[in-house]
C-alpha cells in the first residue's frame, strides 16, 4: 500500500478536529436583551417625526456613508446582533415591502409594548392575551363606517395633499422648509395625476408609474416633472441643437409612430446565445467579425420594418451603434433592469432575447416622438408616447444624502397615492389617532364583562393594568413625534392631541393660541365653552402647573370622572393631569355624534362634532395631516403581532461554532 494512501498509518493528510459547539441559553428578559431593546427604541424614537434627528451610518472599515431618518434606509444600513432585534427589524421590513410607509411607527409601538409588558411583572402569556383583546377593540373602532375613518375625495387636491405632505415633511434629512415641502408635494401630485390613464383611452388601466431622476448640486426649486420618459444619452453632447431624426412608419395602423426594438441580451458580440454552440471557422474568418456581420443584418431588418430606436439592457457594440446612427436609428444601451422596465411600459414592446432576424411586428413597441432634452448640462433622450401617460419626476438638491432622502420619500408618497386609489380612506395623523384610541381603550375595557378576564385567567385589576399599559404605549409613540419640549394635552370632547408650548404655564392666553389640533381637524374655538383639557404625561422638567386664568376663569388641576379607573385597580392615573375649563353642559350633548364601540351599545369612545365631522367637504382649505387608512391599520396589526411573538419566546438559544 502506498505511503500516501488514505489507509496508511503514515498518511500526511490529517483530519482537522471539529470545533465543539458552544450553546448558550438565556431568558428573553435578560438584562442584555433589555438594554439592546432600549437602545434600539431610542434610536428609532429620536428619528421619528419632522423634528427627528438624522442618523449617520458608516461601516467601521469605511465605505459608503448613509445619512437618514427613514426606517427603510436605516434598517438596511445597520447590522443587528441580537436575535430579538433581528426579529423586529424583519417584521418592519416585511411591512415596508408592501406598504412603503409606517416603518418607524411599527417598530416604536412594537418596542414599547415589549418593554412595558416586561416591566409590568405579569406573565408574558397573560400580556399576549390582553394585547389581543385590546387590539381587536381598536381595529373594530377603526373599521367603523361612522368612526374615525375619513373619506378622501380623489378629485380634491387639498385632500390628496393631506396624504402627501406628511410623508414628505416628516423627514428632516430632506433639508426643506415649509414652502419647499409644499412645492415638492404639488409636483408629486401633478406627476401622479399625469400618469393615470384616461378612462376614455383604449389602454388597459394600470397603476401609475412615475420615473424619478435625481440631480445633485442644484436647488430644490429646480425640480420639475416631464411628460414621458428621460434616458441619459452621454453620447449626445449638450451643445447639440439639431432635432433627433428617426425613421418612422408612414402607412398602416402605426402610421406616424416610431417603432422600438427592446433587447435584454448583449449586442456587443458576446451574447450568451452562443455559449454552448460548437462551430468551425475557415482560416480567413474571425468569430467576432461574423457576429458583428450577423448583428448588422439584424439592424438592416429592423430598419426595413421602420424601427427608429434600439434599446438594450446590456451593451451595444460601438460599431453597431455607428451602423445604427448612420441609418438614423437611435441606440440606447446599459439600461439596467430598472430602466428597461420603464422603456417597456412607455413603448409597450416585448423584450427580445434572441438575435434572430425574424422579429414579428407585434413584438415591436411604439413611440410618438423622440427628442433631445438638455437638462442641467446633461443630455437625455426624451421618449414620448401620447397613448401611454408616463411621467418623469426630476428632483434637485444640493447634497447627495439630501437628494437620496428626497427621492426615497417621493417614492413613498407616490406609493401612498397609489394605495389611495384602491382604498380612499384616511385617519387623523400627527398622534391624534393614538390619543383617541388610548381614550377608547380606557373607557371600553371597564365595560367589558367579568367573564372576559376570567376566561384568560387574570383578575380585573391585572386586566385593567395591562390595558392601561397598551394605552400608554400608544400615547408614548404619539408624543415621540415632537422633541422640542412641548407639553401634550387632549380635550375630552374630541380627544385629539394638542401641543402646549413649554412656557404655556405662564401664558394666560394659551388656549386661544393653540389654533388647531396636531392633525388640523379640530380647532380650539369649536364648542370652546364645553372643553376640558387633560395634560398627558405630566409637566416636563419637573415643573408643576398651577392655576391658570383665562378670561377671568380660574383653571385648576383635577381629575375627570371619565378617566378614573375602578378603585380595585392598582393602576393610578397620576400620569394624567386635568385642566378643567368649564363643566360640560348636558343640554348641548345632542350637538355631538357619539363614536360607539361595536357590540357594546351606549359606550362612548369619543365624540365627533356633527358640524365638523369627517366629511370630504371639511378637508377643503385646511392644512391637514392625515395617514393612509390601509397603511396605518396594517402597521398597527404588525406591531401588536410582532410584540406578542416576542413575548411568547421563553429562551434564546445561540449555537456558536
Name these PLM-found stretches:
Residues 2, 6, 18, 29-33, ...:
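N-terminal switch/interaction subdomains of large nucleotide-dependent motors and GTPases
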Residues 2-7, 134-427, 541-542, 649-657:
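Long, structured protein-protein interaction/assembly regions in large complexes
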Residues 11-30, 40, 88-95:
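Transmembrane helical cores of multi-pass ion-transport proteins
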Residues 31, 399-657:
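Extended, low-charge hydrophobic alpha-helical regions
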Residues 32-41, 81-97, 298, 408-425:
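Short, hydrophobic/aliphatic alpha-helical segments
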Residues 62-94, 277-292, 296, 300:
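Glycine-rich oxoanion-binding loops at beta->alpha junctions
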Residues 83-117:
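Elongated alpha-helical scaffolds
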Residues 101, 110-155:
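Hydrophobic or amphipathic alpha-helical targeting/insertion segments
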Amino acid at each position: 500500500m502506498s505511503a500516501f494512501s488514505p489507509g496508511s498509518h503514515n498518511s500526511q493528510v490529517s483530519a482537522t478536529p471539529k470545533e465543539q459547539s458552544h450553546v448558550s441559553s438565556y431568558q428573553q428578559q435578560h438584562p442584555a436583551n433589555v438594554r439592546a431593546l432600549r437602545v434600539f427604541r431610542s434610536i428609532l424614537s429620536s428619528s421619528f417625526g419632522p423634528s427627528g434627528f438624522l442618523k449617520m451610518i458608516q461601516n467601521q472599515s469605511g465605505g459608503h456613508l448613509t445619512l437618514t431618518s427613514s426606517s427603510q434606509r436605516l434598517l438596511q444600513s445597520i447590522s443587528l446582533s441580537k436575535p430579538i432585534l433581528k426579529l423586529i427589524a424583519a417584521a418592519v421590513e416585511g411591512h415596508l415591502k408592501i406598504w412603503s410607509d409606517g416603518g418607524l411607527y411599527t417598530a416604536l409601538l412594537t418596542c414599547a409594548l415589549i418593554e412595558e409588558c416586561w416591566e409590568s411583572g405579569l406573565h408574558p402569556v397573560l400580556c399576549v392575551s390582553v394585547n389581543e383583546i385590546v387590539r381587536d377593540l381598536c381595529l373594530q373602532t377603526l373599521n367603523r363606517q361612522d368612526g374615525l375613518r375619513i373619506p378622501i375625495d380623489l378629485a380634491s387636491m387639498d385632500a390628496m395633499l393631506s396624504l402627501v405632505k406628511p410623508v414628505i415633511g416628516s423627514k428632516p434629512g430632506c433639508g426643506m422648509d415649509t414652502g419647499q415641502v409644499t412645492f415638492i408635494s404639488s409636483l408629486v401630485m401633478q406627476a401622479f395625476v399625469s400618469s393615470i390613464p384616461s378612462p376614455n383611452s383604449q389602454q388597459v388601466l394600470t397603476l401609475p408609474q412615475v420615473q424619478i431622476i435625481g440631480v445633485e448640486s442644484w436647488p430644490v426649486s429646480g425640480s420639475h416633472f416631464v411628460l414621458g420618459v428621460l434616458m441619459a444619452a452621454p453620447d449626445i453632447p449638450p451643445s447639440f441643437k439639431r432635432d433627433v431624426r428617426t425613421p418612422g412608419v408612414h402607412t398602416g395602423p402605426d402610421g406616424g409612430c416610431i417603432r422600438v426594438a427592446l433587447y435584454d441580451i448583449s449586442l456587443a458580440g458576446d451574447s450568451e446565445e452562443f455559449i454552448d454552440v460548437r462551430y468551425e471557422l475557415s482560416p480567413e474568418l474571425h468569430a467576432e467579425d461574423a457576429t458583428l456581420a450577423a448583428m448588422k443584418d439584424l439592424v438592416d431588418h429592423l430598419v426595413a420594418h421602420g424601427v427608429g430606436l434600439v434599446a438594450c439592457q446590456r451593451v451595444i457594440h460601438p460599431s453597431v451603434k455607428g451602423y445604427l446612427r448612420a441609418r438614423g436609428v437611435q441606440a440606447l444601451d446599459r439600461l439596467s433592469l430598472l430602466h428597461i422596465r420603464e422603456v417597456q411600459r412607455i413603448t409597450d414592446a416585448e423584450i427580445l432575447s434572441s438575435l434572430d432576424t425574424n422579429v414579428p411586428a407585434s413584438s415591436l413597441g411604439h413611440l410618438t416622438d423622440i427628442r433631445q432634452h438638455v437638462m442641467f448640462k446633461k443630455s437625455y433622450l426624451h421618449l414620448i408616447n401620447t397613448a401611454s401617460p408616463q411621467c418623469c419626476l426630476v428632483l434637485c438638491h444640493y447634497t447627495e444624502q439630501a437628494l437620496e432622502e428626497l427621492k426615497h420619500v417621493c417614492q413613498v408618497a407616490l406609493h401612498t397615492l397609489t394605495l389611495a386609489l384602491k382604498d380612499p380612506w384616511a385617519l387623523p395623523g400627527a398622534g391624534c389617532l393614538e390619543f383617541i384610541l388610548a381614550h377608547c381603550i380606557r373607557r371600553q375595557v371597564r365595560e367589558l364583562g367579568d367573564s372576559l378576564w376570567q376566561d384568560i385567567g387574570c383578575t380585573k385589576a391585572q386586566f385593567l393594568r395591562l390595558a392601561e399599559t397598551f394605552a400608554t404605549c400608544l400615547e408614548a409613540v404619539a408624543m415621540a413625534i415632537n422633541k422640542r419640549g412641548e407639553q401634550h394635552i387632549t380635550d375630552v370632547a374630541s380627544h385629539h392631541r394638542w401641543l402646549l408650548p413649554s412656557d404655556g404655564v405662564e401664558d394666560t392666553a394659551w388656549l386661544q393660541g393653540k389654533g388647531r389640533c396636531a392633525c388640523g381637524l379640530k380647532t380650539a374655538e369649536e364648542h370652546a365653552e364645553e372643553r376640558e383639557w387633560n395634560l398627558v404625561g405630566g409637566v416636563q422638567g419637573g415643573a408643576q402647573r398651577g392655576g391658570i386664568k383665562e378670561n377671568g376663569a380660574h383653571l385648576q388641576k383635577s381629575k375627570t370622572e371619565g378617566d378614573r379607573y375602578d378603585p380595585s385597580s392598582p393602576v393610578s392615573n397620576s400620569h394624567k393631569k386635568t385642566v378643567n375649563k368649564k363643566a360640560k353642559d348636558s343640554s348641548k350633548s345632542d350637538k355631538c355624534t357619539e363614536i360607539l364601540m361595536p357590540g357594546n351599545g351606549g359606550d362612548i369612545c369619543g365624540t365627533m362634532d356633527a358640524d365638523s365631522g369627517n366629511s370630504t367637504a371639511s378637508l377643503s382649505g385646511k392644512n391637514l395631516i392625515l395617514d393612509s387608512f390601509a397603511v396605518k391599520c396594517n402597521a398597527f396589526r404588525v406591531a401588536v403581532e410582532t410584540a406578542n411573538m416576542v413575548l411568547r419566546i421563553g429562551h434564546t438559544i445561540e449555537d456558536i461554532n
